[in-house]
Structures are given as structure tokens and as C-alpha cells.
């Protein structure tokens, strides 16, 4: 490319840039896909787009060159630029999703073909990538007849286990490849772990590592958008081509199993194409009826809907038993996020401001929740057994969670109080479900009491000093009593506000009227703590958002943060969902 032209980053977050790129791609028979980087080639001193291309992580997409300026030198320079950006992100392999007419250009730059469809090709360049994954798959091969299932398991349901068990009976070895793309409600790590623990009773099942080569942003991006169109059909064809010519042969799999799909049109079309494409490469397709209840297939989407609506019992009825701890952990993280998102709040971090905190903000709190989530799973799994765990077992997991939280927040104590309370409830709830197959209030309260009573009172902490100075119970005493205020007052109060836009805010204020908040006592003393209760009571009796905003501004000036009340609000949200 001559010095008369230049490559420049072209942020698509700028509306005018996005509109120009969309129009440029449309003129070249393409549409704008989801991208996190885009670059354009222009003449020096001119802003007319002559060529452009983008990245979605390590996948080059939306490559186009103006018909009036078909210069392969520009194409090569543009692709080299995009490759360097991808490599700077620590990716060792770069993929490109493009039109077949561009295949030779990319092959001249060291790319090799992975899969093809009539209207698109997928190529790759790099030292690792498919060859590394192929070696891994070949290492898993077993003697005898092998089959394959590609599964999202978002989350792992009784229906998933039913399909796997049915397929496993028909082969000597059954390989499960979980979808790796992390744009599901449950992360890839969680979904893979759910599959592994859920299939332990099936000796001939091997859960493989997922990859970018099965239902991913590279092979099938519209799967995650659920947009059934011509582009989706092209992507399905590419994905199935990869399976037939590369993945299945690497595993030695001769059968691909799939569940029937009566509802989702995207998956239904994918199954139809599977029957057309895979047999051409000697791979049989076995489509099995899904497990149904009341004439409706058990689906992961129904579980996700129930979780979004905070209906644990409805979600739990559909999942495989080993998935229960993951549901409880998800509800715990959702409860923390719901408390954080409730805005405005008096003196507390929310989406608007940091309240009375100088060392915290919204993004830091989000990082803290994200860091705690895997440990919520571990705590729930600890409780999911016949016997309640010991205080030492709980303490060990709690300290691990606290270390991860502090690492994520640069040693800022964002959720230590919430971690203790939620950890106890998660363990108790998981234990109750394991024993009774349901979570009911009284057995849950009893289990919380037993767990908390085993904990020694902490010494040398701010909470310990506050308890001694002001003769208040604190977090451990509340838990050892089974959270009577929460179960008897705060939870019923939240539930009677169902449908109220300000239910969370009013419940927070109601908690503030009752709780001896050790955060407030530590910061400001007993007199201010009493004043906080009175102010919450007054605002609650004559509530308005404007007055809530004023109270927040006042608490920011006075350095008042009712953090203990925020923890109890999160716990109230969690118990409301668990006991739904």
C-alpha cells in the first residue's frame, strides 16, 4: 500500500462512524456484525472509506474493499493491521470469517481453510489453534463405537441428563463438547463443571474441553442472537462442516446425537441441516425425543426464566440435582447485584454515585460480586450433602472467597459482611434441598442457627469493638438466632410491596429502622446510629424519591453509610427468591 493511504482505528461507539461503516458494508453486500474493533483505509487528507475490517476478539470480520478501489495491497495491509491488534491481545491464532472470493487473499497471508459454505469461508492463521485442539481431541479417542453431543447446558437440566444417558447406551464412548462461548447466563466454567459432576454416574461419558470450533462467535454467532436468516443458515453450514470434517474425525466419532426441538426455530433449522450435511461425511445423526412434563419439553430457557423471576422452586424442579448449588449461587450473585443496582440509596454505592465511600464505586462492587460468585458455588456445594459441614470447613472456603474478593478490589472490603451472611444461607439452603428435596422456612432457619452457633465470635475486628462498646449483637448473633427480624419482618414487608417500583428502597429503609448497623456505629457512634433509624422511619412514613435523594446527599456530607442494612437487603432478596 502506497504512502498516499493510511489505516486508522474507527470506533463504532461513535454514532456517525457506525452509520458510515454500516452503509459502506451494505454497499459491498455485507452487514455489520458484533465487533469490538474496526479500522478503515482512507486516502491521506480524505475521509472516504476505501476499505475496512474489524475484530470480534480474535476473529476478523466485515472485511470489504470499495469496488472502485480493488487493490490487494490495501487488503493485505489492512489484514496485517488487524492481525497485529489481535496478537497484541495475547491471541496465538487469528481466524477470519469472510466471503469465498476473499479466500485466496487470506491464504496468501498464511491463513488455511477450516470450513466452507456456499457463501462464506472460515480460515485461521497462527501457531496454535485448530492443530492444538485436534491433538487434544485425538488424545481422547477410545476403541469401539463413539458418539458426540455438542451441548450448551445453560444450565444442566434433567432433560440434558436424560439425552446424554439415552445416547450413552448406544455407543461405547460418548463425547460431550460444551459450548465455550461465554455469553450465557452461566459461564463456560460453570456449564462444563455442571456437565462433569452431572455425568459422573455415566461411566462411558467424557466431557471434553470446549473450543472456538463448535457453536462459537467464529462459527455460529447468530446462535446467540437467535436470528434465523440467510446469514444464520450460512453459519450453521460452516459449523456443521467443521464438525463433520474435523471434530468428529479427530474423536473417531461416527454418530452425532441431538435432542428434538419443537419450539426454537433456530435450533430446529440447525437440526435439519445436520441431517443433510453430516451423513455426507459418513456421520450418522440420531435425533432423540426430549424429556417432557405435561406435554412440554424440559428446557434450560424455562430455568433461566424462573431464575430471572426469582422463583427458585420452579427452576429447581427442572434441573438435574447436582445443578442445585449453581442455581443457589446464581441467586446469591443476583441478590447482591440487585441491591447494588437499586438507586438512589442513602450513603451507599449505587449506579448514581459512591455514597459516603471514598474507596468504592459501582464498577468495583461489580468486580467484587464477580469474584465472589465461584465461591458461592463452592459454599452451596459444601452444604449439598447429608451432614452439615463443620465451622472449620466453612471458614476455609469463606477465607478463600474473601482473599479473591480483596484481590479483585485491591484490598477494599466491599462484601465481607454479605459474604458471611450469604455463605451461611447458601450452605443451609443447599443442605435442606439435599435432605428434603425442597427448601422450607423453618428447617432453613434451624440449619442457619446450627451453622452460626458453631462459629467462634471474632476478636480484634471493627465489629467486635462495636459489639463490646455499644452492647449490640452483630452479624454472628443475628445468624445464630436464625435472622428473626429478616424472616419475621423484612421478608414479609418486601413481599407485601410486590409491584411497587420502590420496593427495594422502602425495604432498605425499613431495615434501617430496625437494625443496629455496626457500620454506622463504627463510623459515627450511637447517637448518629439512633438518628439514622429516626430519619429512615420518617422517610418511610412519607416516602418520595426526591427526599431519598436528599437523604443520600446528607449522608454523603456526614459520612454515613448503612452498610449492614445493605447486606441485610441483599440477604432478604436472596431468601425471597429461595423461598418462592
Predicted regions and their residues:
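Conserved GNAT acetyl-CoA-binding A-motif
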Residues: 86-99
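Conserved acetyl-CoA pyrophosphate-binding loop and the N-cap/start of the following alpha-helix
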Residues: 69, 73-81, 159, 163
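A conserved short alpha-helix in the GNAT/GCN5 acetyltransferase fold that borders
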Residues: 70, 79-87, 168, 303
